Swiss-Prot record:
Cysteine disulfide partners in this protein: none
Phylogenetic classification of the source organism: Bacteria, Bacillati, Bacillota, Bacilli, Bacillales
Catalytic activity line of the entry: Hydrolysis of proteins to small peptides in the presence of ATP and magnesium. alpha-casein is the usual test substrate. In the absence of ATP, only oligopeptides shorter than five residues are hydrolyzed (such as succinyl-Leu-Tyr-|-NHMec, and Leu-Tyr-Leu-|-Tyr-Trp, in which cleavage of the -Tyr-|-Leu- and -Tyr-|-Trp bonds also occurs)
Protein name: ATP-dependent Clp protease proteolytic subunit
GO-annotated molecular function: ATP-dependent peptidase activity; ATPase binding; serine-type endopeptidase activity
SUPFAM superfamilies: ClpP/crotonase
Superkingdom, natural source: Bacteria
UniProt-listed NCBIfam families: clpP, PRK00277.1, PRK12553.1
CDD domains named among the record's database cross-references: S14_ClpP_2
Amino acid sequence: MNLIPTVIETTNRGERAYDIYSRLLKDRIIMLGSQIDDNVANSIVSQLLFLQAQDSEKDIYLYINSPGGSVTAGFAIYDTIQHIKPDVQTICIGMAASMGSFLLAAGAKGKRFALPNAEVMIHQPLGGAQGQATEIEIAANHILKTREKLNRILSERTGQSIEKIQQDTDRDNFLTAAEAKEYGLIDEVMEPEK
């Protein structure tokens, strides 16, 4: 069951009910809290474009708690983050795994964060193929090219060498928030404000 809280906002013109995500969007906050597929990517991209149209100078905040998902859907979000004018701050809450960690690293340099108990997981892209041998070969070549592209971008975003990225993503590689900072996936571990 998917329960989405409602927030009641009272103004001098009366009361208005918002679902929590719409209310957060008013504060330029976007939540990525699920597996990344085309529908999720279209929603995130739409929100990014909407917020840029509202104000192209103010930062946008992308909170990430995601196990990852589709590489092509993730690239749609990544490319939009790089394309729009406002800086996108990325904040890992819970877990940013696979394409979720890639999007975490996609934030504006100096504005990529994780909460102290958050985890980040990087690995190579997953894929499968079936059919005739030539079709399997085509799919295998495609996933290798995709891996090279992901490794190149992660190298640019983290400052790690492509060789190190390739070695570190050969298998699931889980990092604490502090380790993600040391690796260059994030810039700071957020400390409690209390």
